[in-house]
């Protein structure tokens, strides 16, 4: 799924302050009005007054804060079986006095589509609405038939805000939201404007008491939210979701373990390298410093390199990506630098898509313009696919894969082996006066793109 379409919460790639907005939990002391966030940002209490920790694990992130006798944590994770993000919040009163603490959640909903989210505000500011009922915030993008999200909790809220600007206040930021500062949400909701998910819960913590709250940000309508809330209000189901994720990754790691004299190197290779590879093969580079979610499709070289890394841990996904890349190859032997797999997938049109009814004219892509010419071909793109296929066959033993028939992007079909041969032949033909492979539009270094040069790296890759 591309985050160009149907993104749930807002992402500003070049925001100031940096890395905003997030999925935040604020805490407020009713006695003196002091407030802070469980994660260091956005409130940013001085580090000599509060202790903060952030830990990234396998498919979860935990923030921890120890401030003024309140130890708090917030863990974000997505269960494998449900389209919901769980915010597992725990608070403990470590003092010998009763504490009255208000908890405020906050996330900022988007207008789903990156173009609508960043332009034509005359339209976009009226394209969504929010409502609160049965302790659930429902967010609705009007131009999508199924454009709903919800935000709810396992406890009965004492307040809510559905409007971003009502929660934050005029000329304020996530640093100092007016709702948290005054200690109460305003109950805002509206058809139109910018929306958020904020639920308020007022707690009374006895000395040493610990409480656990679960906030749920999910895909679907209020009815879907009710079902998810019922399920994850049972802490046993939350813990089971953690256990399922843990088992999933332990099974991945068990496929291959590297041992070196350096423990840091072992952790890097066995844990984080595989985790990064698995995430990349699933999501590609859809959201990164390059695209911030605005580039739909697969980068040819990126995906070919991704496929090379996980045939032992995820052979099914490796095979899928290889086939998609083979379909994105032209009969001349170069790959389409950027393409959507569905363009060349014969079964893609059979999938049920969420209809998006744009109020403005969106030009239809002409099929003949999808396949770019040699002038836009990168010399290294398709070469990475050859070793990826070889590694897949070596790991799985599926030698018959080389004889399977796959289509070309510009028409016709051939075996996997024939695709590989065209890739190698293309590089052998695209050489300069010295016999070194041409750089074409660019080799692996996209910044060297003035054309006319030769690439030692591509020549080495071709020989390999």
Model feature map: region roles:
Residues 50, 58-63, 81-84, 94, ...:
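Hydrophobic, small-residue-rich alpha-helical packing segments that form membrane-like cores
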Residues 26-29, 298, 303, 307-434, ...:
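Aromatic-rich carbohydrate-recognition surfaces in CAZymes
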Residues 258, 283, 401-402, 439:
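Short clusters of hydrophobic/aromatic residues that line enzyme substrate/ligand-binding pockets
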Residues 256-260, 403, 407, 415, ...:
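Short, charged, low-complexity loops and linkers
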Residues 1-303, 315-328, 355-364, 391-395:
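Anionic coordination/interaction segments
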Residues 285-291, 365-369, 443-450:
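Short glycine/proline-rich turn/loop motifs
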Residues 204, 209, 295, 382, ...:
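Ser/Thr/Asn(+Pro)-rich, low-complexity disordered segments
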Residues 106, 342-343, 441-445:
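A glycine-rich phosphate-binding loop feature that marks nucleotide/adenosyl-phosphate handling sites
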């Amino acid at each position: 799924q591309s985050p160009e379409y149907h993104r749930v919460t807002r992402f500003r790639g070049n925001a100031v302050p940096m890395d905003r907005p997030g999925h935040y939990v604020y805490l407020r002391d009713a006695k003196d009005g002091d407030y802070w966030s469980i994660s260091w940002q956005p409130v940013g209490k001085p580090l000599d007054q509060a202790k903060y920790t952030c830990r990234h694990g396998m498919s979860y992130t935990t923030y921890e804060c120890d401030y003024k006798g309140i130890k708090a944590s917030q863990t974000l994770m997505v269960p494998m079986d449900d389209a919901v993000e769980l915010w597992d919040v725990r608070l403990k009163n470590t003092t010998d006095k009763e504490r009255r603490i208000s908890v405020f959640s906050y996330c900022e909903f988007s207008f789903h589509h990156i173009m609508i989210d960043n332009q034509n505000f005359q339209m976009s500011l009226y394209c969504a609405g929010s409502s609160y009922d049965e302790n659930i915030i429902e967010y609705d993008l009007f131009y999508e038939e199924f454009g709903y999200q919800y935000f709810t909790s396992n406890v009965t809220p004492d307040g809510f805000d559905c409007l971003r600007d009502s929660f934050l206040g005029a000329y304020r930021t996530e640093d100092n939201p007016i709702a948290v500062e005054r200690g109460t949400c305003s109950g805002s909701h509206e058809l139109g404007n910018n929306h958020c998910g904020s639920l308020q819960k007022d707690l009374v913590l006895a000395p040493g008491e610990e409480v656990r709250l679960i906030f749920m940000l999910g895909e679907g309508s209020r009815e879907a939210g009710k079902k998810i809330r019922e399920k994850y209000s049972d802490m046993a189901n939350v813990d089971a979701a953690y256990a399922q994720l843990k088992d999933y990754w332990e099974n991945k790691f068990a496929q291959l373990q590297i041992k070196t004299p350096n423990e840091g190197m072992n952790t890097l290779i066995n844990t984080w390298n595989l985790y990064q590879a698995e995430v990349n093969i699933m999501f590609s580079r859809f959201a990164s410093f390059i695209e911030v979610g605005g580039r739909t499709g697969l980068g040819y070289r990126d995906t070919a390199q991704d496929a090379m890394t996980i045939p032992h841990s995820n052979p099914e996904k490796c095979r899928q990506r290889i086939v998609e890349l083979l379909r994105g190859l032209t009969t001349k032997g170069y790959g389409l630098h950027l393409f959507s797999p569905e363009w060349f997938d014969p079964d893609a049109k059979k999938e049920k898509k969420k209809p998006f009814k744009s109020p403005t004219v969106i030009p239809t892509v002409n099929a003949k313009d999808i396949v770019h010419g040699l002038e836009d071909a990168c010399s290294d793109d398709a070469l990475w696919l050859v070793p990826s296929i070889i590694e897949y066959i070596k790991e799985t033993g599926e030698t018959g894969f080389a004889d399977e028939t796959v289509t070309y992007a510009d028409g016709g079909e051939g075996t996997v082996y024939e695709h590989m041969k065209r890739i190698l032949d293309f590089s052998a033909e695209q050489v300069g006066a010295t016999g070194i492979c041409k750089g074409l539009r660019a080799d692996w270094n996209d910044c060297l793109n003035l054309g006319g040069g030769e690439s030692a790296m591509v020549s080495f890759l071709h020989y390999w």
